């Protein structure tokens, strides 16, 4: 996957991803209109399909709502790369079908850098800077869940194959 980096700092909580007043919505497309509204008001209008959210430590902390990864899925970002994730956000993102990668080098990535990401190897190419970073690759079964669009879709596939 290849896209432009949208850079955020440490401790980006789920309220920053999708403000609480929009929790009345529950579809990815509707939530996408308000993604990062309080911290990057231009995000929803300027994000492009396959762009990549990059952050520091503890991304997705705070409330354990599924709305945050749903909003990111609706925004059509290809993945989220961070130094670390709040555990429940990490699980929710996988269950929703949003790839998440932990990488210790997110400080080297700047807003607007063009990145190429290989989920199977964890390789991140910063095309803008000519650098390569190593993220922790997702295990095969987790990639299968993400590739199917989330846990529910993955379970449906398993049932239909029986």
Curated annotation (Swiss-Prot):
What this protein catalyses is: (2R,3S)-3-isopropylmalate = (2S)-2-isopropylmalate
EC numbers, comma separated: 4.2.1.33
Name under which the protein is recorded: 3-isopropylmalate dehydratase small subunit
Q: Which organism is it from?
A: Methanosarcina acetivorans (strain ATCC 35395 / DSM 2834 / JCM 12185 / C2A)
Q: Which keywords appear in this protein's UniProt record, sorted alphabetically?
A: Amino-acid biosynthesis, Branched-chain amino acid biosynthesis, Leucine biosynthesis, Lyase
What gene name is listed for this protein? leuD
Oligomer and partners: Heterodimer of LeuC and LeuD.
What the entry lists under Pfam families is as follows: Aconitase_C (PF00694)
Q: Does the keyword tRNA-binding apply?
A: no
- Family listed: Belongs to the LeuD family. LeuD type 2 subfamily.
């Amino acid at each position: 996957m290849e896209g432009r980096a949208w850079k955020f700092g440490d401790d980006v909580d789920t309220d920053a991803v999708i403000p609480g007043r929009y929790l009345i919505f529950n579809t990815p497309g509707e939530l996408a209109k308000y993604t990062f509204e309080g911290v990057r008001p231009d995000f929803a209008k300027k994000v492009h399909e396959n762009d990549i959210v990059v952050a520091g430590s503890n991304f997705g902390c705070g409330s354990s709502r599924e709305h945050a990864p749903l909003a990111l899925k609706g925004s059509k970002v290809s993945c989220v790369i961070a130094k670390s994730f709040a555990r429940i956000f990490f699980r929710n993102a996988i269950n929703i079908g949003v790839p998440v990668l932990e990488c210790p080098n997110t400080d080297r990535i700047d807003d607007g850098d063009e990145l190429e990401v290989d989920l199977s190897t964890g390789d991140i190419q910063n095309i803008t800077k000519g650098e390569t970073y190593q993220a922790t690759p997702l295990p095969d079964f987790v990639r299968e869940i993400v590739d199917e669009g989330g846990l529910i879709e993955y379970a449906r596939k398993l049932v239909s194959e029986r």
